[in-house]
Swiss-Prot record:
It is found in: Secreted. Residues 1-45 form a propeptide. GO terms for biological process: regulation of cell migration. This is Somatostatin-2. Somatostatin inhibits the release of somatotropin. Disulfide bonds join 62-73. Keywords: Cleavage on pair of basic residues, Disulfide bond, Hormone, Secreted. One of its GO terms (molecular function) is hormone activity. Belongs to the somatostatin family. The keyword Disulfide bond applies. The gene is sst2. GO terms for cellular component: extracellular space. Residues 23-58 are annotated as: Disordered.
Length: 73
């Protein structure tokens, strides 16, 4: 029973260690697993859509108070 409990805790520690890895390390590990299992490699471009647009500047909302509530401009 104690050996099984130790194995479960070591598995939990391994999962937590993997979750705390930086994204690049996790992606590299996932690629190593997929190549080891014979699966095709997926590039980062194929996973996420390309983001060619600059980040949108946040526009400060116009907060005019009206007796029923705030209105937007």
């Amino acid at each position: 029973s104690a050996g099984l409990l130790t194995q479960e805790w070591s598995a939990v520690e391994d999962l937590l260690a993997q979750m705390s890895l930086p994204e690049a390390d996790a992606q590299r590990d996932a690629e190593m697993v997929s190549t080891a299992t014979g699966g095709g490699r997926m590039n980062q471009e194929s996973i996420e859509p390309p983001n060619n647009l600059p980040p949108r500047e946040r526009k400060a909302g116009c907060k005019n108070f009206y007796w029923k509530g705030f209105t937007s401009c």
